[in-house]
A protein has these predicted regions:
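Secreted, disulfide-rich extracellular signaling modules
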Residues: 1-261
Length: 261
C-alpha cells in the first residue's frame, strides 16, 4: 500500500556535493552524521499570499521525512529517514499588509475588531475605567459584542472565547473567571449565541468577567488590559469579525450591575 506523499524536488547544485560527501552520508540508513547536518526543513508555498498547505499530523498516519536520490541507471539509492515522532508543532505567520485587519492593528475605538484562531490576532480591551469603582460593589460585569455576519465566510466564526491578561510576573495567564470555568460551572461564558435586538436576529459573545473587574477595582491587579482570544486556539482555523466600540448601531460595551456599600 502506498501512503499519500508530498514530493518536493531538492536543488541539485546544492545537494549533489552533499550527497557525495561520505562524512555526511554514510552507507547506513538514518546516519547520525546526516541528522546532525540536516536539522530540519521549512516548507513555504508559492505564491506566499493566500496560500495554505494541509498535512495530516495525526498519530494514525505514517509521518516520515525521507531524502532519496537516484544514480545514473535510475536506481533509488540509500534513503535517509527522519521520523517526526509523536510530538509535533505548527507555526503560522500572517502578513496583514493591505488588509482590513492590518488597518486596525494597534488602533482603539474602531468600528470592527478581529479575533482569529491559530497564530491569528487577539482582541485587546482596556478596563482602566473600572478603577473608579474602588468604593463600589460590583455585582456583575459582562463584556458584550456582536458578530458581523459575513455573506460568504472563508471559515467558521470562533465558537468560544477565552480571556487572559499579563500578570505581575510578565506571564500571560487566564483571568479568574476563565480558570473557574475550567474547574466547575461555566462562569465566563464566551460562546457564540443568537439574540434578538430591535427585531433583528444577531449573534453575540457575552463574557462574564465580574471577578476580574473586582480585582482591578480593588487594586489587586495592576494591569487593566485583557486579551480575548479563540478558545482552543491551535486546534482549528476560525475567524470572527466583531462590531467594535465605535460601531454606530451595536457597539461593544461593558455592562455593569453595581450598588453602593
Amino acid at each position: 500500500k502506498s501512503f499519500a506523499q508530498l514530493r518536493i524536488p531538492l536543488k541539485p547544485d546544492f545537494w549533489l556535493p552533499i550527497l557525495g560527501d561520505t562524512s555526511i552520508f554514510s552507507n547506513e540508513e538514518n546516519s547520525a552524521d546526516y541528522k546532525e547536518f540536516v536539522k530540519g526543513f521549512v516548507l513555504r508555498s508559492s505564491p506566499d499570499d493566500s496560500s495554505i498547505a494541509g498535512l495530516n499530523l495525526s498519530n494514525n498516519s505514517p509521518l516520515n521525512i525521507t531524502v532519496y536520490y537516484t544514480n545514473l541507471t535510475g536506481n533509488v539509492q540509500d534513503s535517509y529517514l527522519i521520523d517526526i515522532g509523536a510530538i509535533r508543532s505548527s507555526e503560522f505567520m500572517h502578513d496583514y499588509s493591505n488588509t482590513p485587519v492590518g488597518d486596525v492593528l494597534g488602533q482603539v475605538n474602531t468600528d470592527f475588531a478581529y479575533i482569529q484562531s491559530m497564530q491569528g490576532v487577539n482582541l485587546s480591551v482596556d478596563l482602566s475605567s473600572v478603577k473608579t469603582l474602588e468604593n463600589t460593589i460590583v455585582n456583575k460585569a459582562q463584556l458584550e459584542f456582536f458578530l458581523l455576519e459575513e455573506t460568504d465566510p472563508l471559515v467558521d466564526p470562533v465558537a468560544g472565547l477565552d480571556v487572559l491578561f499579563i500578570n505581575e510576573n510578565g506571564t500571560s495567564t487566564q483571568i479568574l473567571d476563565s480558570s473557574l470555568s475550567n474547574t466547575s460551572a461555566d462562569y465566563l461564558g464566551g460562546s457564540l449565541e443568537s439574540t434578538v435586538v430591535g427585531g433583528q436576529t444577531l449573534r453575540k459573545y457575552e463574557l462574564d468577567i465580574s471577578n476580574h473587574v473586582i480585582l482591578i477595582a480593588r487594586g489587586e491587579i495592576e494591569n487593566p488590559i485583557i486579551s480575548i482570544e479563540a478558545r482552543n486556539k491551535p486546534q482549528r482555523a476560525t475567524r470572527s469579525i466583531v462590531l467594535g466600540q465605535s460601531h454606530p448601531d451595536f457597539p461593544m460595551r461593558l455592562k455593569l450591575v453595581t450598588s453602593k456599600p
